[in-house]
Swiss-Prot record:
The gene is rasP. Belongs to the peptidase M50B family. This is Zinc metalloprotease RasP. It is found in: Cell membrane. Zn(2+) binds at residues 18, 22. Its EC number is 3.4.24.-. The keyword Zinc applies.
Amino acid sequence: MNTLLAFIAIFSVLVFVHEWGHLYFAKKAGILCYEFAIGMGPKLFAFERNDTIYTIRLLPIGGYVRMAGEEPEQPTIRPGYEIGLVLDEKDTVKELIVNNKSKHPEAQVVQVERIDLVHDLFVETIDEDTGELVRYPIDEKAFIVQDEVAQIIAPWKRQFGSKPLPKRAMAIFAGPLMNFILGFVILLGLSLYQGVTLSSEIVINGENSPAEAAGLQDGDVITAVNGVEVDSWKEMTTEVKKYPGEEVSIDYERNGEALQTNATLSQVEVMPDEYEGFLGVSGVPEFSLLGSLQYAGNEFINMATSIFDTLGLIFTGQFSLDYISGPVGIYDITDQAVSLGIQTVIFFAALLSINLGVINLMPIPALDGGRLMFLAYEGIRGKPVSPEKEGAIQFIGFALVMLLMIVVTWNDISKLFS
């Protein structure tokens, strides 16, 4: 149960922050956002506020912000259609009833001669008594009602495509940006709470560790590993990681006296068939805002670059599905994190948040990076890709992403039962 709650909490926070970034900058640019969704599939909960429907959906595989103009959302109303008009006291259209007009006795039923729901916002009809053409202005926040479902209209000035390119790009980039900010803030908060390890002073971790076997003690300060001088915890651990399972020389100071010993390092598998050396020591934490900022920045860079390194294996032929995880694999890792304590769970959330930001910036159609790629093409070419072509490419990209998710999930399940 703890694992399930942690998984749901991490997923919800990461997706919420990502989609909130899209929503905030889209609304700031004046773009109408029809829906803000956490999850996919059937709707579990919904409420409406400021022209946007906020929903929680069943499947924890993502989320979305549906912006006006990105795809056809409104029912089509053409000349010759018979619709109902709900007017205010100034004869401005507040609602356009597409069907089931008998359920709306307040609506005036007319036959459409001309209609513009995008630019000039009007509907023209013939007055049955006089035979004259009558034009009704349409409120920019009028609703179209079809099958008793009301949806606000999207005038051109509130559509995604009407905004300057930088504002559109920011509305797309804001999702990954918020994940990066969240990841950094989590790392900073953890380091301020736990303290950060700056010096190479050590504390022995458990009995029978390589450090204890080599005669090292709490309070020793390591000054060199295999002849390479180290002045900080980061430099020391970087050198140790280079020698998995090997014997190394350790220079250290104890009570001001320079000493040396040899240690046979353990090895830890960090990726399939990839190992790092392990000495079995911890650092001595220090509480410093500057040190915490430095730690958070370094960890952020390390996490981001490790993701890029993994993705880079695709181009060298060394990539394996074991290097990535879908929802099932993430749930399994969450279970391991829960067993290690709340601070490990929070650290894992930071890693996932940064991971989500990086993956979403990949130039793959259906991801934010793919959408930014289309905007970059528009900026260079001077005009956007045709909606038909972009829609087809986005659909293919989405299908490939879904296929990859299915394959990865199957691989995760296979690993669980192997």
